[in-house]
């Protein structure tokens, strides 16, 4: 019950007491018909002062909020499509290539060619054939150390050129053990073997790679052609 309710209750109670007192006084006044119930006269009650209530507080003004915005409706996206499953292909097998074999060389006989010169006095002692002259009938020797030591010799022509045929026991499979030597000159004034292309120690045979010249047919046999030199003799020059 609030303050106002309590005040109203007290006011009603005071009025009830006042009414009861007035009624009692009227009944028990002197000269009443009841001589035995004569009561002294009560003084009138002072006026009841009602309690002063504090002024009601002004209602609290709640802050005014702006109206809530309507919720933003997001666009409805279509359902995502299931990923396309690509077919699984079997692994690709690498192609099977035929085995590669080293080139086969037909076994042939061996022919060695070269040129022999006599150096010019200007280049005596120098490995240079500029101004040199070809030597005719110079002796060239081929030594092959294979299963059987084989030696063969030949002489140069007027152009100093020679073609030396190895023995038929020597083939192109055996040339690693073959060396060509410059042996002797018919000219006593140009007879010392020079070191040009190892003519004195033995020159290694080099195969001719030019097509059409790498082999030759002689005496019904096929020969693989190899180069050596050129070789040269040192001249005896006037001082």
Curated annotation (Swiss-Prot):
Which family does the record claim for this protein?
Answer: Belongs to the non-classical AGP family.
Signal peptide start and end residues:
1-24
Q: Name one GO biological process term.
A: regulation of seed dormancy process
What are the alphabetically sorted keywords of the record? Cell wall, Glycoprotein, Proteoglycan, Secreted, Signal
Domain of life of the organism encoding this protein: Eukaryota
Q: What does this protein do?
A: Proteoglycan required for the timing of seed germination. May function in the abscisic acid (ABA) response.
The encoding gene: AGP30
Q: Where in the cell is it found?
A: Secreted, Cell wall
Q: Which residues are glycosylated?
A: 106
PANTHER family, A to Z: NON-CLASSICAL ARABINOGALACTAN PROTEIN 30, OS01G0164075 PROTEIN
Other remarks on this protein: Over-expression of AGP30 severely affects shoot development.
- State the phenotype upon gene disruption: No visible phenotype under normal growth conditions, but freshly harvested seeds of mutant plants show reduced seed dormancy.
Write the protein's name: Non-classical arabinogalactan protein 30
Q: In which tissues is it expressed?
A: Specifically expressed in root tips.
Which cellular component appears as one GO term in the record?
A: extracellular region
């Amino acid at each position: 019950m609030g303050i106002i309710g309590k005040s109203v209750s007290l006011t009603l109670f005071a009025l009830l007491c006042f009414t009861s007192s007035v009624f009692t006084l009227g009944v028990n006044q002197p000269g009443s018909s009841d001589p035995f119930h004569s009561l002294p006269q009560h003084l009138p009650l002072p006026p009841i002062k009602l309690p002063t209530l504090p002024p009601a507080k002004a209602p609290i003004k709640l802050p005014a909020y702006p109206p809530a915005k309507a919720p933003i409706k997001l666009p409805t996206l279509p359902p995502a499509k299931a990923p396309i499953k690509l077919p699984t292909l079997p692994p690709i097998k690498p192609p099977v290539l035929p085995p590669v074999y080293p080139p086969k060389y037909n076994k042939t006989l061996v022919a060695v060619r070269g040129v022999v010169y006599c150096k010019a006095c200007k280049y005596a002692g120098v490995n240079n054939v500029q101004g040199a002259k070809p030597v005719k009938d110079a002796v060239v020797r081929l030594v092959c150390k294979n299963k059987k030591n084989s030696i063969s010799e030949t002489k140069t022509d007027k152009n100093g050129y020679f073609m030396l045929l190895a023995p038929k026991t020597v083939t192109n499979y055996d040339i690693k053990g073959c060396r060509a030597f410059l042996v002797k000159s018919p000219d006593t004034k140009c007879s010392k073997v020079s070191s040009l292309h190892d003519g004195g120690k033995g020159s290694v045979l080099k195969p001719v790679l030019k097509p059409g010249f790498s082999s030759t047919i002689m005496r019904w046999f096929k020969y693989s052609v190899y180069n050596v030199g050129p070789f040269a003799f040192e001249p005896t020059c006037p001082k």
